[in-house]
Amino acid sequence: ASFPEFDNNIFARGISVKEWNEMRNDFNHPFTNKIINGLYPPGSVIKMGVALSFLDNGIGDNYNVNCSGSLTIGNRNFRCWKSTGHGSVNFRRAIAESCDDFFYKGSLRIGINKISHTLDKLGFGEQTGIDQINEFSGVNPNKEWKEKRYKEPWYVGETVITSIGQGNML
């Protein structure tokens, strides 16, 4: 657990106003319950939901990619965690080895809105409903969400980083 992030025994003896203000204004936010109030990218755990979206949209055992260790889109290079690449990767191997390049390429085939739709069905971007006070909702980004939130278009690179649980996905 991450809460509290300080020795709460200091309050038993009493603390000064100076100590209180230092803790309250601490960059690490020691009074924040990071489990229910922290927003963090999910990382590779999202790949199971993205894999379900792939299956729903025709990407399965018959889909193979060559992972060279990175994918270039425009002037941007999106790296796989395995910099030397995985070589030829099918659906099952991509999941077993968490091949980023497979998820990048699959996400480009089906698009962010289909991925977002599947993740919606799984409850991503919503509160858990476990009755925690002040629980924050995460974000399940898509084209409409970005246009509404930032008044900007969705870029292809955002699709690939979302497929591995990074970017606007909190």
Where are these regions (language model features)?
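Beta-lactam-recognizing serine transpeptidase/beta-lactamase-like catalytic domain environment
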Residues: 1-44, 49-170
